[in-house]
């Protein structure tokens, strides 16, 4: 992959082979910013996963950095008021299933009660490819609608390892206070360790790096449990 002049200039400003303590790594990422927009800071956690092992879960980052999410709740008519009172942007059953089937996607997150999943599951071609399908593992298939909406609006995010065993997660904006980005990164590292498969072998976390949208990656000398 070819990189432009700005990227190469940023790369020359630090030792790209060195690992830095997390606060310093965050400061470097912010110093290397060169885009005119408020770049997103992303963390990349490389894991040692054996055959058949996977990591997928959710966490509420200590510091939210994105606008409020529009939540759609698939539920029976008798629970619509409960969902809307809890902060859902939309709630209902057949009406919204048909709207989504027709291509309507004016929401950021979908939640469903278990009794709705038989019908919601048929929306896989629309919701699945966009990562919007409700799933029990991410807490978006639940009978406790109010709690789910509350956590989602607080900034609960899903994280999962890709086929290469790497978890990628946005953790802030370069305009944020560095300490808030540090706390968000540390929260992911700690939660990833808590979800370590019981039969995982060797060094579970192989490496951690952070970068901004346009900038180069910075290796992190990470610590667990701080």
From Swiss-Prot:
Pfam families per the UniProt record, alphabetical: Ribosomal_L1
Gene3D superfamilies linked: 3.30.190.20, 3.40.50.790
GO aspect biological process, one term: regulation of translation
Protein name: Large ribosomal subunit protein uL1
Family statement: Belongs to the universal ribosomal protein uL1 family.
GO molecular function, one term: tRNA binding
Record PANTHER family: 54S RIBOSOMAL PROTEIN L1, MITOCHONDRIAL, LARGE RIBOSOMAL SUBUNIT PROTEIN UL1M
Gene assigned in the entry: rplA
Function of the molecule: Binds directly to 23S rRNA. The L1 stalk is quite mobile in the ribosome, and is involved in E site tRNA release.
Organism: Treponema denticola (strain ATCC 35405 / DSM 14222 / CIP 103919 / JCM 8153 / KCTC 15104)
């Amino acid at each position: 992959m070819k990189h432009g002049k700005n990227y190469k200039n940023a790369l020359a400003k630090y030792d790209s082979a060195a690992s830095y303590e997390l606060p310093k790594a965050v400061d470097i990422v912010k110093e290397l910013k060169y885009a005119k927009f408020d770049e997103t800071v992303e963390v990349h956690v490389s894991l040692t996963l054996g055959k058949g092992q996977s990591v997928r879960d959710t966490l509420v980052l200590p510091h939210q950095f994105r606008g409020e999410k529009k939540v759609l709740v698939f539920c029976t008519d008798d629970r619509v008021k409960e969902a809307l009172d809890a902060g859902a942007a939309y709630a209902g059953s057949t009406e919204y299933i048909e709207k989504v089937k027709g291509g309507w996607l004016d929401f950021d997150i979908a939640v469903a009660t278990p009794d709705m999943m038989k019908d919601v599951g048929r929306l896989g071609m629309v919701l699945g490819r966009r990562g919007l399908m409700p799933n029990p593992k991410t807490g978006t298939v639940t009978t406790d609608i109010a709690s789910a909406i509350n956590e989602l609006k607080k900034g609960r995010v899903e994280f999962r390892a890709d086929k290469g065993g790497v978890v990628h997660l946005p953790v802030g904006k370069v305009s944020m206070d560095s300490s808030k980005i540090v706390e968000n990164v540390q929260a992911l590292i700690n939660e990833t360790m808590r979800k370590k498969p019981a039969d995982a072998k060797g060094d579970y976390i192989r490496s951690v790096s952070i970068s901004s949208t346009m900038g180069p990656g910075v290796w992190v000398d990470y610590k667990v449990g701080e």
